[in-house]
Regions:
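ATP-dependent adenylation/nucleotidyltransferase module used to activate substrates
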Residues: 1-147
Length: 148
């Protein structure tokens, strides 16, 4: 099967513009993780909204490699971005919550792991609302595959 990649890109860019306009927004905020899914979405967002696209890199006990990949992508495509370190917020919240919620083992690990994307989500929505933008969400194909 032959695919016209430029036509697919143009279709997605047009769709993004339509959805943002329908919502009465001016652009998009996107979280860039250093992975393939957010990289593709970020480049599409930049094409759709060259002057109204903000990328956020939101490390929270993340690998240095993820941060490097994110910055390389964003610099390569000349996208405006901010790095918002969430480590301290995460640790503070864990300390407060676990002072009265006693858990151990796998349940504790799961709750801690789930808190990280929720902190990122809150940060993305705060930033988007402040600008009159929408959050351009990204999926993670490997998470979908395993049912996360």
């Amino acid at each position: 099967m032959t695919m016209n990649c430029e036509a697919v890109v143009q279709h997605l860019v047009t769709w993004l513009r339509e959805k943002v306009e329908e919502a009465g927004a001016r652009g998009v905020v996107i979280g860039v993780s250093g992975g393939v899914d957010s990289a593709v979405a970020a480049v599409l967002a930049q094409k759709a909204f060259p002057d109204n696209c903000m990328a956020l890199v939101l490390p929270c006990e993340s690998s240095t490699e993820d941060l490097i990949h994110s910055r390389l992508l964003l610099d390569r495509f000349n996208m405006p971005y901010r790095v918002v370190e969430l480590d301290n917020v995460y640790q503070l919240l864990i300390t407060k919550l676990e002072s009265y919620i006693k858990l151990d083992g796998s349940k504790r690990r799961l709750l801690r792991a789930n808190l990280k994307p929720r902190l990122r989500m809150t940060t993305l929505y705060y930033s988007a609302q402040a600008r009159g933008y929408l959050v351009l969400g990204t999926t993670n194909k490997s998470e979908i595959t395993v049912g996360y």
